[in-house]
């Protein structure tokens, strides 16, 4: 079986993809048996192609699942951890802009009673 194009896989339904995955896995099992029994060299070189095809199908399946989850959680308040943006640990623990801008009562009073003086230079 020749290698398949990924754009063709993306157009298929989930049932078609799982069926194709089963076909590839069955073919891989046959090729491995042929390898053990000393099969033709062209079959041995085909193992790599089939393994890559299996990887492609699995990748497309997982990408479809993830995009469906993204759509499901689009307007929700909280997201699952794997759908959140990947940032460094320090950035994730940083205060939010709102939290950083909050001031204590004492700070508010001090700013109210002693505002920053503004000077105009006379020329």
Swiss-Prot record:
One of the record's GO cellular component terms: Golgi apparatus
Keyword Cytoplasm: no
Keyword Magnesium (UniProt): no
Pfam families: Ribosomal_L29
Recorded GO MF terms: mRNA binding; structural constituent of ribosome
CDD domains: Ribosomal_L29_HIP
Gene3D superfamilies: 1.10.287.310, 6.10.250.3450
Keywords linked to the UniProt accession: Ribonucleoprotein, Ribosomal protein
Gene Ontology terms describing biological process: maturation of LSU-rRNA from tricistronic rRNA transcript (SSU-rRNA, 5.8S rRNA, LSU-rRNA); translation
HAMAP family: Ribosomal_uL29 (MF_00374)
Family, per entry: Belongs to the universal ribosomal protein uL29 family.
Protein name: Large ribosomal subunit protein uL29y
């Amino acid at each position: 079986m020749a290698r398949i194009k990924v754009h063709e896989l993306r157009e298929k339904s989930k049932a078609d993809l799982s069926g194709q995955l089963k076909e590839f896995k069955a073919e891989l099992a046959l090729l491995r048996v042929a390898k053990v029994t000393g099969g033709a060299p062209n079959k041995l070189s085909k193992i790599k192609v089939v393994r890559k095809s299996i990887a492609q199908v699995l990748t497309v399946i997982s990408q479809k699942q993830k995009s469906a989850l993204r759509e499901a959680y689009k307007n929700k308040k909280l997201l699952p951890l794997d759908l959140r943006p990947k940032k460094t640990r320090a950035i994730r623990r940083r205060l939010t802009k709102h939290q950083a801008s909050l001031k204590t009562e004492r700070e508010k009073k001090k700013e109210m009673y002693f505002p920053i003086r503004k000077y105009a230079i006379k020329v």
